[in-house]
């Protein structure tokens, strides 16, 4: 087929909507949504998404290389694969989003937004994921990797955020995340509106949001910084063994959320504060009218601080180290 990324950015449709090479069949399902299926039976179904935020281009470029290699027959495919470029309209504009943050709209939350292109797109992506996994065998292993970059710099340059899960995480999934070069893993303890929360909660997929560096425009990313995750993705898609991790990721869990509830909200952090900056117990983190948010534990670490979110949305997460796991590293 034509270049999938360029086709997505143009908003066009391919002349042929399905085809095959010697290793796989492909189907163009919608703008930015491509299904690739091996010509033989496989036990795994994998969703790889990127571009949910339109200014986070490095993951899109990483996925583009994989898709091109698959379509040219240069890379074997050992999983059913659904590739998603999440927000084509925002990607064209190099903006985080056009009207609203799509990664707060999944799990049906898109119904709360009227006349919002991101809400309509979230519904389309939910349907595509539903159809993809329903088409597979009930026993197949389901993984969802949602690739992002962070707005701010970070003490952990690359890290993963895992949604709430009621059952233990599969060991092979944890090993893969380590082999991808992630320096830290953050575990949510509550449900939310992210794409990975949707895939985990509704389809019992092993899901992770991978935060890979900082947001830059197309053509300005140094993809050599992501050598570990690029190799890990190739190995996963081609059915190879995990590359041994250089080090095990540090583990954190969410201790509290900072939410902007009114126009009087003030976040007591500078724009230069990095993700995973530590604050001691008793530190005033935010004010919102008469409400105050303080560090509750002996030490908490901030993640995704953003005072400019819309009212009602998350303005930051506070984390504590998961010492039970970290002592075993």
From Swiss-Prot:
Cofactor binding description: Binds 1 zinc ion per subunit.
Pfam family, one: AstE_AspA_hybrid
Annotated positions binding Zn(2+): 53, 56, 148
Transmembrane stretches, start-end: none
Cofactors: Zn(2+)
Biological processes per GO annotation: arginine catabolic process to glutamate; arginine catabolic process to succinate
Enzyme class: hydrolase
GO terms for MF: hydrolase activity, acting on ester bonds; succinylglutamate desuccinylase activity; zinc ion binding
Cited InterPro entries: AspA/AstE_fam (IPR050178), AstE_AspA_cat (IPR055438), Aste_AspA_hybrid_dom (IPR007036), SuccinylGlu_desuccinylase (IPR016681)
Pathway the protein acts in: Amino-acid degradation; L-arginine degradation via AST pathway; L-glutamate and succinate from L-arginine: step 5/5
Reactions catalysed according to its record: N-succinyl-L-glutamate + H2O = L-glutamate + succinate
Active site: 211
CDD domains to which the protein is assigned, alphabetical: M14_ASTE
Keywords, ordered alphabetically: Arginine metabolism, Hydrolase, Metal-binding, Zinc
Superkingdom of the organism of origin: Bacteria
Its EC number(s): 3.5.1.96
Function (record text): Transforms N(2)-succinylglutamate into succinate and glutamate.
Alphabetized NCBIfam families for the sequence: arg_catab_astE, PRK05324.1
Family the entry assigns: Belongs to the AspA/AstE family. Succinylglutamate desuccinylase subfamily.
Designated name of the protein: Succinylglutamate desuccinylase
Naturally occurring in which organism (per UniProt): Erwinia tasmaniensis (strain DSM 17950 / CFBP 7177 / CIP 109463 / NCPPB 4357 / Et1/99)
